[in-house]
Amino acid sequence: IVIDYLQLIAGSGRGGENRQQEVSAISRSLKALARELEVPVIALSQLSRSVAQRQDKRPMMSDIRESGSIEQDADIVAFLYREDYYDREGENDGTIEIIIAKQRNGPVGDVKLAFVKEYNKFVNLEVRYDDAMA
């Protein structure tokens, strides 16, 4: 199940809940749904605007919009980062970073891939023998 984008899901409408509480309840419900149906649920979320104010634009867990419970409930949190999105004047090297910020059952880290913008396609970077030996 893919949810594009989590913050568009309407809350329960119960009085007294703010949007952060609603998003937390939605996040918990999706986690319960995944367990009940024994299927993965991929929920896309928007980042807060604070990313644009920082020098280093790479997204962090605290940038997830409207709820800390999203990062708590998730088994995996991954971000996409393209330097050329923020530095349009710079040289586009055609790469994208997948930042694995949280993985409940494994390691975290970054993976750099080639990004073919015309096709919205990710491909493995070619590793030359010279680069691999350095």
Q: Model segments located where?
A:
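Helical hairpin unit composed of two closely spaced alpha helices linked by a short loop
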Residues: 1-44
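C-terminal regions of RecA-like/P-loop NTPase motor modules
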Residues: 15, 28-38, 49-134
